[in-house]
Amino acid sequence: NMRDYPLADDKYAIEQLAARYPFIDGTKVGIYGHSGGGFMSAAAICTYPDFYSAAVSSAGNHDNRIYNKGFVEIHFGVDEKVKTGKDSLGVEHTTYDYSVRVRPNQELAKNYKHGLLLFTGAVDNTVNPANTLRLVHALIKADKDFDMFVLPKCTHGFFGESEVFFEHKMWRHFARLLLNDHSADADIDLNKYMIEDERRR
């Protein structure tokens, strides 16, 4: 199981670390992921809404029924039902019905409480934006509060000014929800400080 078992395992590990190290605040936990990680980060905040305070999910394959079948079969497993029957001329035919074993994230939407930021590339040809839109539709139907951005020129990877925009939105999202720091809404170039820090070493 690529979703439920790892999510429980991650939560347990974070709880153990927070109990062991006083500098870790176990009441303010955030999670981020892209692609399969985007699937997991959205699933995490929907599965454990009282544990995760914030999540950023980008380009997530939230509904594996419309994702790459080869990937899904290898990593999630597919149940196959084989039916045989005869048509009106008496010719025997075999039909195959496949179902994905993992539930789509939109089925978890009812559990979600707060703190989710979704991103998708408008021309993503790896994980179709419909994956994110299906989750969005479920969240709206459940009257849930969340934020979402569509990056117009982006495929599965974010690049250029869109990548910078995405990074800044993610930093600000986590700063607000995990640190109660609204000063992060100001434009701060963290890369500049990281480069300067490297030069001092």
What are these regions (language model features)?
Residues 1-201:
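Active-site-proximal cap/loop segments of hydrolase catalytic domains
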